[in-house]
Amino acid sequence: VKADLPKKQKGAVAIEFAMVFIIFFAVFYALVSYSVPLLMVQSFNKATAEAVRRSVALDPATPGYDAALIARAKNTLREQLTWIPQAFNFNANNASDATVTYAGGLLTVRVHYSTDKLRQVIPFLVLPGLGSVPALPANLSAQSSLQF
């Protein structure tokens, strides 16, 4: 003989499941939606630091040193960020995504990626009382500098 739950208990189980599912989904969505921007920012930090680090190896006696230094930093930045898929619309050659400057002996490598581009890949939820999830700044950015 199979023992079955009374109807009142079946309804309680359904309500409990609905509440647990909402909490589970919220945690899962937050984990997924925040991990991609965090991964990108860490990659930007590593790429800018590596671009500056590799530029140090360039001989200052090289003809056209300033241009060669900027070119080396840009190439390194591009190499380090090749893993970013095309869907993210990131272009290290584009001045709106990355800049390399050398002025007064200061080499600065910057990456600034618009969150609007990220919205094309990750769906942002707008929750009443909380706002947009994930809550991100207007730009994901990183910068490394070195005084020569």
Q: Which role fits each region the language model picked out?
A:
Residues 41, 50-148:
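Short, conserved structural patches
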Residues 2-78:
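Alpha-helical assembly-interface signal, strongest on the long, hydrophobic N-terminal helix that forms
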